[in-house]
């Protein structure tokens, strides 16, 4: 049911050219949630579709009071659609669902139960255990999930499953990272921020209409994105830890080679055709100083970022929160 007051659940559905899927999807959502005693809404984000998707949504909105829809002027891709959907969401919980009918809305009640299990979780990610896709999608996906699990430190089988359930504070934490294709790493981002993440096997259906937007470059792009988000999240506040360590290793390696060349020259009076090795030593020392300088500059930028007032997310609180501080007028300082 929909409501004008507080909303329990918002379902964000990004879509691109899915006009044939929308009516059966709305029927499935209604059947799955209408008897759950929840106030809910579904926010469809049309990512610049060139078919009649938005017109179908406009027609369906007359039958489903919980339906809301927004449309981009052109295609900005899934991360932008999710970001807009998260900003539009009014629920205390936020679910995501793909519009191609491969995700089953009937799984959302199961995600709600899993979110409250074992003392409560903050994010429950679906796992397409029996995936209804060709090998050209499943094999690269398995490799991607294995590498992402190893790098991120959180063991999940299916980072890219479109069916997920978030508490609102996780959504707000994730918004700054919703660009490019980084939406695939939202469970890892939540885990790094200290939120409790769980996984739940969900039903996966074959695609009924249209064609997949999956491309062969997604595996390579995903691995590059993984390196990017790992640096941004883990070293945003301490870039010197990364660049300083690499710079120190490079400088030490160059210094060791330089010491060897110096000792050789001291003992024999010549470096014995070790000129390439000497050039390598000089290069390593220069690169080491450059990396160290990059880390120092990064620390200065991180300090400015921290002064902007952003603090790590709070999990629990005892007692009232402090009232926001207001700076006195300049003439009273």
Label every PLM stretch briefly.
Residues 1-142, 147, 166-171, 192, ...:
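Structured catalytic core of nucleotide-sugar glycosyltransferases
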Residues 77-89, 102, 106, 130-258, ...:
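Conserved catalytic loops of nucleotide-sugar-dependent glycosyltransferases that act on lipid-linked
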Residues 14, 32, 36, 45, ...:
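Histidine kinase transmitter module recognition
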Residues 39, 121, 196, 203, ...:
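Residue-level detector of anion-binding/catalytic polar loops
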Residues 236-331:
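Membrane-embedded multi-pass helical conduit in multi-pass membrane proteins
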Residues 52, 185, 279:
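Short Gly/charged-rich anion-binding patches and loops
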Residues 8, 19, 26, 105-108, ...:
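Membrane-embedded alpha-helices of multi-pass transport/permease systems
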